[in-house]
Amino acid sequence: MEFSHKAIEKKWKKYWEENNTNKTTNTSDKKSYVLDMFPYPSGAGIHVGHVKGYTATDVFSRYKRMNGYDVLHPMGWDAFGLPAEQYALKTGNDPIDFTLENIKTFKRQLKMMGFSYDFDKEISTANPNYYKITQWIFNQLYKKGLAENRDVEVNWCQELGTVLANDEIIEKDGLMVSERGEHPVTKRKMRQWVLKITEYADRLLEGLDELEWNSSIKDLQRNWIGKSTGVELDFLVNNIKVPVFTTRIDTIYGVSYIVLAPEHEQVLNITTPEQLKEVQTYIELAKNKSEIDRKDESKPKTGVFTGSYATNPHTNELVQVWVSDYVLANYGTGAVMAVPAHDKRDWEFATKFNLEKKFVIENKTDEKAFVGEGKIINSDILNGMDKKQAIQTMTKIAIEQGWGREQTNYKLRDWLFSRQRFYGEPFPVLYGPNQEITLIEDLPVELPRIKNIKPSGTGESPLANVEEWVNVEIDGVKYRRETNTMPQSAGSSWYYLAYILADGENEFIDIDSAEAKKRFEKWMPVDLYVGGQEHAVGHLLYARFWNYVLYDLGITSVKEPFKQLFNQGMILGPDGRKMSKSWGNVINPDDIVSTHGADSLRLYEMFMGPLDASLPWSEDGLDSALKWIHRAYRMVMTTELTDVNDTKLDFVYNDVVKNVSEMIESLKFNTAISQLMIFVNAVYKHEGPVYRPYIEGFVKMLSIYAPFIGEELWEKLGHAPSITKQAWPVFDPSKLVSNTVVIALQINGKLRATIEVEKGTIKDKLLELAKKQESIISYIKDKEIIKEIAVVDRIVNIVIK
């Protein structure tokens, strides 16, 4: 007995749509907020990689609904961004219209897959009603002193006509290029908006301890924040004070030189005339190097001597001052005291330029840098001390003598928050005649609809060309609008709250209203957040920062927005490589749904392996999923049902319900499917009618993976839709004691097969069953049986000649 997946999908999509089946309920005291990282609506539509994460959250959401939870499972669009703007520049199309068309495609595909999103909660970051709240949040940040307009060194891409964030840049041949298009990127000073995320560094660090996140993601954030405590020391160079930050003041006797970053403000001031040209050339070369390249410890060290010497503030010894790009201006003071005997990078640098190496920690070799623990040596008053004691002693001396102070530093930089683009949220900011800043409270400030969105050529955004929009007169005073726009990460930093505020498609209640507070208390935090690991130190950090600020303002009810985070693995191409148009290995879900059906695709991707594993696409695996769904369908449709339980399936059914429930809770979706297969196999082996509640319970469990076939089978079993409104099956612990045993079947003492029988099956019956097994028949056919041994509940052994 077969079925047409196309007919079933059409039928149930229509039913769900007409009956608003997926609408969020508010009837339970239990809630589950299940969230996908929302996509950028590109022209390509969703791919099978999207399907993996989205299916996982859909399975989990359906499971929670059937367990009596109010479930918020929404979807929206990270709609602003450079790709739409670049497409518009190439084609002459409006990026807003282009994005809206892409959203239609995405939405069609998501419905095609049977995902149970509540599209009454749909959002788009590019909708004015949405970015009205983004602008409101910016105003609160400004009022709290967390938003500032200042001159900063930025990553400038001339080809794209905009500033790029570090996570929008890649390294190619040691140089910085844009991730999109691989255009050259250079450093330049520009006036930009920045958000002072550094003021929340400690809280963001401490908050990680509360979270049910993968430890690797938490470590990425800890390292990105990069908190370190130490001492800031003053080295004198030609009477110019050069502060140096160190966490190892105990090694001060081992300093052989100091190194300044090429961008350090004092480099040219301390360089001798003889070295000036060489230093200037080096600085220019360093400007085009990526930070990734400069941090790469495998790359050969480069540098140049300034010609000057610094005075060690404790020993008064003169040491050379060098400039090298392995020192970064944006960490610490942009200057380091080099102790090559006990630092790998300093050792390589000193070796290359033939600089002195002084060992000040006891060790057994002088052929490489010793970075381990040991007693202090060659250090006068510190000799014999351990690291902790020596640090305490030297810190006290530095503070008392006035050339040092305790300092805490962070690698985390303030968030560069403006872009020279058209397609982004406008800032709600006006500049007066004397450049004084006035916030616009009447929101939203909407983007103008214009055809010419080409870069201004001046470093300003294309909005600078729209004079009628830029220039504003209020009460006779002329103002000029801020022409930069916010980065794409602005809208994604609070979108998890937007779903809660949504009242119909892109309609929102006020974020600071009493109703909003009530809703936040109901739904926050997000209980399960699924998305890619690539967002670990961008979006996830920014969203946590904004949530902390909104918590401080009394808007949100919790400090941390995402309780549990899970990073799904990738779906690789059949060749094992990452799917890419250039490789020609991209799999389009539209094609798969057409040939195999949405349920088969969902089931296959969940059964491939653990959710966090990256695995290659397999057509054979997809075919197997389709065959199994048909096998399950036939089982339900052809099995004779009874309301009288013969108890023979008690153990297997209750064991499967227990295991599937536990596995779904722990996101082990693949092993839960294996349990469903066990039940199907057991029913096919069962003789006689099957207890109806067990078949119905199976269909409920199947439906969270395969919702189309689940609905169809539920209806054919005589029930009114929708199966999503049914209660999840409950196992009976008293029936988890098996009434069957597995009997080993041996030929001449060697295991040849096994059979499952009821406990206590008598010897003669065991022998009869054993001789009916095909694998045993092949051994005993035309052979003389010398002896037959049968042990109840254990073994059958047939001895042949």
From Swiss-Prot:
Taxonomic lineage: Bacteria, Bacillati, Mycoplasmatota, Mollicutes, Entomoplasmatales
Name of the protein: Leucine--tRNA ligase
Keyword Ligase: yes
Top-level taxon: Bacteria
Gene: leuS
Any one GO CC term of the record: cytosol
Annotated source species: Mesoplasma florum (strain ATCC 33453 / NBRC 100688 / NCTC 11704 / L1) (Acholeplasma florum)
Chief subcellular location: cytoplasm
Alphabetical list of Gene3D superfamilies matching this protein: 3.10.20.590, HUPs, Isoleucyl-tRNA Synthetase, Domain 1
Entry EC no(s): 6.1.1.4
Protein location: Cytoplasm
Signal peptide limits: none
Extent of motif 'HIGH' region: 39-50
InterPro entries named among the record's database cross-references: aa-tRNA-synth_I_CS, aa-tRNA-synth_Ia, Leu-tRNA-ligase, Leu_tRNA-synth_edit, M/V/L/I-tRNA-synth_anticd-bd, Rossmann-like_a/b/a_fold, tRNAsynth_Ia_anticodon-bd, Val/Leu/Ile-tRNA-synth_edit
Annotated GO MF terms: aminoacyl-tRNA deacylase activity; ATP binding; leucine-tRNA ligase activity
Example GO biological process: leucyl-tRNA aminoacylation
